[in-house]
Amino acid sequence: MTVRDVDVPIPEQPGAPYPIVTKCCDIVCGFGRGSSELGIPTANVPVDQLPEVVNKLELGVYFGYAKVTPVAHDLEQVEREDGRVVSYNYGSHLEEDNGDLEVLPVVLSVGKNPFYHNDFKTVEIHILHDFKSTFYGAKIKFNILGYVRPELDYTSKEALIEDIKTDIEISKQVLDTEPYRAHMAELLK
């Protein structure tokens, strides 16, 4: 496993304050950077729909599991802050045969994205799964099981992408151990 100077040692099983388990949250459109600029799509959730403990977490990269659930709703076109129109399909294109509805591993950022000069906190969840379509408007329930590293600023997009890839590698290895896999069941309740 690649280890960087900024990585925090990850225990063999989650310890306080983990696990943190959310209720179902709305998946909303973000800035469109995860997919288009970085090649790393994220499911963005409103911070105000999360448990208060999430707001108290140190800014940085975390890992856990998530379950996406479609919502019965008509398709909508929603305008983002940048003026781009995004289709909200509420998860109507999620495919059970593709594994889209299973509990899936995630890497998530709780932060302000200093590379993009944000001055407000966001929670962006990268689900480690190959979805065939977007699912804005669907619901997501997720847990946070541990902390990888603090939020960093970057001098280049390439350096940011490389660190995200390392975050994914570390998270996959940890989440593939039984003490962490045992927490998948929390999302089925």
UniProtKB/Swiss-Prot annotation:
Zinc or magnesium. GO terms for molecular function: ATP binding; metal ion binding; riboflavin kinase activity. It comes from the Eukaryota. It catalyses: riboflavin + ATP = FMN + ADP + H(+). Pathway: Cofactor biosynthesis; FMN biosynthesis; FMN from riboflavin (ATP route): step 1/1. Its cofactor is Zn(2+); Mg(2+). The keyword Chaperone does not apply. Gene3D superfamilies: Riboflavin kinase-like. SUPFAM superfamilies: Riboflavin kinase-like. Belongs to the flavokinase family. This is Riboflavin kinase. It comes from Candida glabrata (strain ATCC 2001 / BCRC 20586 / JCM 3761 / NBRC 0622 / NRRL Y-65 / CBS 138) (Yeast). The lineage of its organism: Eukaryota, Fungi, Dikarya, Ascomycota, Saccharomycotina. The gene is FMN1.
